[in-house]
Amino acid sequence: MRQYFKTALLAGVLAAGSMVMSATADTVKIGFNVPLTGFAAADGQSALHGAELAVDQVNAAGGVNGSMLELVVYDDQASPKEAAPLAVKMITQDEVVAGVSGSYSGATRAAATIFAESKVPYISAYAIHPDITRAGDYVFRTSFMGEVQGRAGAKLIGEMLGKKRVTMVTINNDFGKSLATGFKEQAGNFGIEIVSEYEYSIKDREFGPVISKIKADKPDAIYASGYFFTAGPMVSQIRAAGLDQPVVGQEGYDSQKFIEIAGAASEGVMITTSLDRDSNVPETKDFIQGFAKKAGYPADMVAASAHTAILVLADALKASGSGDAAALRDAVAKTDLSASTGRISFNALGEVQKDVQVQIVKDGNWHHHSVISDPVLLAPPAE
């Protein structure tokens, strides 16, 4: 039944797809699926603010080839079941020229399939599952796939921090598994011994049993995947139990809300991510200032990544000079753009190639720790 539903959706898209990109208007519509309700709503709101800021900036500068950008927003609740029909609606009814996902991996994968089959460009802002770009050559990603970020975590712990005995705490979903895969792949190359790995559910907020096991492991460092709403309680409980080893996380922690939840326990926590709060790069500084003014709270990774994805499309729309989907897709593929999350370019699979930022909590805020710039280590797959 599920396959029939998917086939029916795609058939409807393909029947209408030939006319989607041919329309010309005073506005250019970009679809944006994002979780505005449900467990991921806080990330969704940040992503939406980031995307809206990018649209505002592009339009204030004159738009794209004389047309204004319009963001067509739908709440996908971070659910694949919601995202797939919304993708169809964006393409067939709203006639968007392209789409951006401001959502998590499950919803992004579902929408990516629809966009790819209908040959409409689609950019994943921050979802990390490796199969997203494999949906087709119309799909791109402006943040790191999970394996790449996991490799960076291994370099950070094993080489940069010099910690060799590591306990892993892995959230049991696509996000956590892909990060763990990358970390394990490179751990040995940086002299890391993985003492133990413990898994937990996205619904978990009490970590006593796991923390007792970590205590017994006596690791040099803890590599723990999660989101701000799981990592906050986890780190707070780790420190309350008297464990003072470095905790290294990833972009899922990248929110001021993590610091609010973990409180003083957040001090010293490090993450691999895409946004450098202390950057002197004009595009990053302007974004951080503009976001704080628009949203009323500090910028985070999901906001910066959504902002970047919209600017990539705006740049490609200018370069392609037409409403032709294939021309727009080719222009996205040739992107070479300085954005809030770094210099953006894509490989043959549509995966981003850029440095990894390392941030650390100091005095209740995220700050620059270091940059991992290693083209070989960070190279995403090309097929």
Where are these regions (language model features)?
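C-terminal segment of classical bacterial N-terminal signal peptides
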Residues: 14-24
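Extracytosolic ligand-binding ectodomains
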Residues: 2-8, 25-383
